[in-house]
Amino acid sequence: MARILGIDPGSRITGYGLIETNNKKTVYIAAGCIRAGEGGLAERLGQIFQGITGIIQAYHPDEVAVEQVFMHQNPGSALKLGQARGAAICAAVNAVLPIFEYTPSQVKQAVVGRGDAAKSQVQYMIRLLLKLPAEPATDAADALACALCHEHAGPLLAGLAGQVRGRRRGRYYR
């Protein structure tokens, strides 16, 4: 059984989502957003670090999946997004958790079936796949999608690392 923390980093709003999988069933645990205040960038990065640290301490994930930075038209925005990712990754590294990174198109492909899917399509599919009563907030849905992407890619990554111990009904397990 693995508990996966998905993170959708942002300099103002960072989404997080937790799922638990036991090779047969994927269960929703929690999701939400860390809203960094209106302070300076350093203060917001500290809030992201502390927020992710608190989530890790509360839910004890086994692995972390983080969405990679995509190129913005504005280089300043891309740099701030990269710094927000760094704060979230540092929180996971500080907790000695394995970190896996996925591009936005990989995440969308895993959840919707199209790498160019709209955010509303991601929200809709997350609601269906995890049997949620309502669509989660955009950033939380992206984080849950990142966790689901890792859940789908996990057996492949484990096989590449030589960690696969067996196969049961078409799915690998550790």
From Swiss-Prot:
- UniProt source species: Nitrosococcus oceani (strain ATCC 19707 / BCRC 17464 / JCM 30415 / NCIMB 11848 / C-107)
Residues in the signal sequence: none
Q: Which residues bind Mg(2+) 2?
A: E67
What EC number(s) does its UniProt record assign?
A: 3.1.21.10
User: Per the record's keyword annotation, is DNA damage included, yes or no?
Assistant: yes
User: Which family is annotated?
Assistant: Belongs to the RuvC family.
Q: Where does Mg(2+) 1 bind?
A: D8, D139
Cellular component aspect of the GO annotation: cytoplasm; Holliday junction resolvase complex
Q: How is the cofactor bound?
A: Binds 2 Mg(2+) ion per subunit.
Q: Which InterPro entries match?
A: RNaseH-like_sf, RNaseH_sf, X-over_junc_endoDNase_Mg_BS, X-over_junc_endoDNase_RuvC
| EC top class, as a word | hydrolase
Catalytic site positions: D8, E67, D139
Compartments, as annotated in UniProt:
Cytoplasm
Q: What is this protein called?
A: Crossover junction endodeoxyribonuclease RuvC
| Pfam families tied to this protein | RuvC (PF02075)
PANTHER family found in the cross-reference section = CROSSOVER JUNCTION ENDODEOXYRIBONUCLEASE RUVC (PTHR30194:SF3)
According to its UniProt entry, the function of this protein is described as: The RuvA-RuvB-RuvC complex processes Holliday junction (HJ) DNA during genetic recombination and DNA repair. Endonuclease that resolves HJ intermediates. Cleaves cruciform DNA by making single-stranded nicks across the HJ at symmetrical positions within the homologous arms, yielding a 5'-phosphate and a 3'-hydroxyl group; requires a central core of homology in the junction. The consensus cleavage sequence is 5'-(A/T)TT(C/G)-3'. Cleavage occurs on the 3'-side of the TT dinucleotide at the point of strand exchange.
A single Gene Ontology MF term assigned here is:
crossover junction DNA endonuclease activity
Which keywords does UniProt give here?
Cytoplasm, DNA damage, DNA recombination, DNA repair, DNA-binding, Endonuclease, Hydrolase, Magnesium, Metal-binding, Nuclease
SUPFAM superfamilies tied to this protein: Ribonuclease H-like (SSF53098)
Q: Which cofactor does it need?
A: Mg(2+)
PROSITE patterns from the xrefs?
RUVC
Q: Which catalysed reactions does the entry list for this protein?
A: Endonucleolytic cleavage at a junction such as a reciprocal single-stranded crossover between two homologous DNA duplexes (Holliday junction)
Subunit structure, briefly? Homodimer which binds Holliday junction (HJ) DNA. The HJ becomes 2-fold symmetrical on binding to RuvC with unstacked arms; it has a different conformation from HJ DNA in complex with RuvA. In the full resolvosome a probable DNA-RuvA(4)-RuvB(12)-RuvC(2) complex forms which resolves the HJ.
